[in-house]
Amino acid sequence: MSTPHINVIGAGLAGSEAAWQIAERGIAVHLYEMRPVKQTPAHHTDKFAELVCSNSLRGNSLTNAVGVLKEEMRRLNSVIIRSADRCSVPAGGALAVDRHEFAQAVTEAVREHPNVTVFTEEIQKIPDGPTVIATGPLTSKALSEQLKQLTGEEYLYFYDAAAPIIETDSINMDKVYLKSRYDKGEAAYLNCPMTEEEFDRFYEALISAETVPLKEFEKEVFFEGCMPVEVMAKRGKKTLLFGPMKPVGLEDPKTGKRPYAVVQLRRDNQSGTLYNIVGFQTHLKWGPQKEVIQLIPGLENAEIVRYGVMHRNTFINSPNLLKPTYQYKKRKDLFFAGQITGVEGYVESAAAGLVAGLNAARLVQSKELVVFPDTTMLGSMANYITTANSKNFQPMNANFGLLPPLDTRIKDKKTRYETLAGRALESIQNFVKKM
């Protein structure tokens, strides 16, 4: 009888972390990476955990959600965070790395682990036996076809079209009202009413705002049925007034009158700490995006926890398909990790790899799989991607809005974040002890 091993497909941030976590638990790993035999349009080397965009892993302080996530990962012996700490370069309050040294450090740590065997080949069929799929946003065509067959075509997406998400506490509730169009069903939307003058000012800012240049392999995105709000706007004002900003059936209960235009906000998570801007998928750069959003009545001081994005990205409908263990619901020995699960960002991808790898190892060891507490960043991210609204699921990054609210409301943002961070780290410490 052959020794049990776990397959890990993809040696990006998530796959490298998953392989490391499994190997550290004494289990053999077969790690498959198609580069350099087959390159993606974004990668340039054969190194593991190659950072293809920025060299920053974002904020490092505990008043920053991704900083808290990193600290949780440090306490779980993350190879990605350990390597980043060793290869860091000065970057103020952020953790930035020398990208070549960082990729080299991760590659060496994982390749040289006695329990890891690396195969340089493209996987075109999902293997039998315990497997972690961590193939990232540029999953190969052959494997995408396999995933389509596995999950069903309607549950596999090839691009992000994410609208901005706002912290509920930062919305001026005196300027907005709760109502559904024509009062159908429960009042599920917050509505931001605009006068004609406010709309004109917003419209001019929107059509003149700077957008992110498209990469060659992303240019097909807009033709797949999802139009950025600024592209829609450039077709004329009426496109918005008859589209996402349509005021019909949304009379303001304070005045009894129909506003000139309305921006709708839809609840984004079960606890109601986050709202997304309906129909506002966008390709605007983040600075101009914030300026445009803050022209919307009620959102003058909006805290944006996830900016609108549109780019090439292969990901699955995790709320329908995954458990918070990152385990596939219909096949208990199959796990997904990284951006393919709908987490967004370098650190978040590695974090998903950590949890998936940990649980794949526990499955092989016949141990109970772990679900991290939702008071931790690791747990709140797993909770979000597996409980978000499956009808309009879009990738999410780490942010404090994912955590359950504190028992006592703290108005000062810095103090609130510090308190949430303290609770998260206490939770992870207690949880790790029990594991």
Curated annotation (Swiss-Prot):
Pfam families: GIDA (PF01134)
Gene Ontology process terms (BP): tRNA methylation; tRNA wobble uridine modification
Parts of the chain that traverse the membrane: none
Main localisation: cytoplasm
Subcellular location: Cytoplasm
Annotated positions binding FAD: 10-15
Coiled-coil stretches: none
Catalyzed reactions: uridine(54) in tRNA + (6R)-5,10-methylene-5,6,7,8-tetrahydrofolate + NADH + H(+) = 5-methyluridine(54) in tRNA + (6S)-5,6,7,8-tetrahydrofolate + NAD(+); uridine(54) in tRNA + (6R)-5,10-methylene-5,6,7,8-tetrahydrofolate + NADPH + H(+) = 5-methyluridine(54) in tRNA + (6S)-5,6,7,8-tetrahydrofolate + NADP(+)
CC per GO annotation: cytosol
EC numbers, comma separated: 2.1.1.74
Names of the cofactor(s): FAD
GO terms for MF: flavin adenine dinucleotide binding; tRNA (uracil(54)-C5)-methyltransferase activity, 5,10-methylenetetrahydrofolate-dependent
Family annotation (InterPro entries): FAD/NAD-bd_sf, MnmG-rel, MnmG-rel_CS, MnmG_N, TrmFO
Keyword list, A-Z: Cytoplasm, FAD, Flavoprotein, Methyltransferase, NAD, NADP, Transferase, tRNA processing
UniProt cross-references to HAMAP family, sorted A to Z: TrmFO (MF_01037)
Task performed by this protein: Catalyzes the folate-dependent formation of 5-methyl-uridine at position 54 (M-5-U54) in all tRNAs.
Protein name per UniProt: Methylenetetrahydrofolate--tRNA-(uracil-5-)-methyltransferase TrmFO
